[in-house]
Amino acid sequence: MPFLFVSGTGTGVGKTFSTAVLVRYLADQGHDVLPVKLVQTGELPGEGDIFTIERLTGIAGEEFARFKDPLAPNLAARREGIEPIQFDQIISWLRGFDDPDRIIVVEGAGGLLVRLGEDFTLADVASALNAPLVIVTSTGLGSLNAAELSVEAANRRGLTVLGVLGGSIPQNPDLATMLNLEEFERVTGVPFWGALPEGLSRVEGFVEKQSFPALDAFKKPPAR
């Protein structure tokens, strides 16, 4: 059962829309895809990232946990006075979707080193499942540093970063943004997959024009 983890250089960089694009792309290649949100914070019942992904792709997903306050998951649990997420619980839950022909696309919470529980991060979960990563980055001033730091943190932990994807680019990008698009691949050392247009509301028409060769490494499902 292959996993693909999607992490960001921070919060609000376009990670959910990027996850939706990757989910739809894999589904269009004939894969059985299950989108998963590990932890949602700060959203009302029936709202949040996993519902956005379903709305954009038409593919329903699963969510492990949610907390009321828009905080890092361990802090949100602490504030609510409930037991924090346990590492073994989340690994067991993910492995419960066991199906050799399914790809589980896992959206993290914030960045790679955000604490999901008191003593573990998204990087630890990805490592335990031997899962590759896609890093979603902002594209404006300061983004090169954030992207390089995220890729370096992943590499130090023995994780494979398949690519860096810009979560949002304005219709009229400024000079810093335009130059950053040319530099991401050089400074991170991994392929840069381009950037999603700001205000993207549908993924189907957009995905049809995209190519993510690194995702072709996932075994194609048998013809039926």
Curated annotation (Swiss-Prot):
It catalyses: (7R,8S)-7,8-diammoniononanoate + CO2 + ATP = (4R,5S)-dethiobiotin + ADP + phosphate + 3 H(+). Transmembrane segments: none annotated. It comes from the Bacteria. GO terms for cellular component: cytosol. CDD domains: DTBS (cd03109). Its EC number is 6.3.3.3. ATP binds at residues 12-17, 107-110, 167-168, 197-199, 204. The active site is at K37. The keyword Cell membrane does not apply. Substrate binds at T41. GO terms for molecular function: ATP binding; dethiobiotin synthase activity; magnesium ion binding. HAMAP family: BioD. Homodimer. Catalyzes a mechanistically unusual reaction, the ATP-dependent insertion of CO2 between the N7 and N8 nitrogen atoms of 7,8-diaminopelargonic acid (DAPA, also called 7,8-diammoniononanoate) to form a ureido ring. This is ATP-dependent dethiobiotin synthetase BioD. It comes from Corynebacterium glutamicum (strain R).
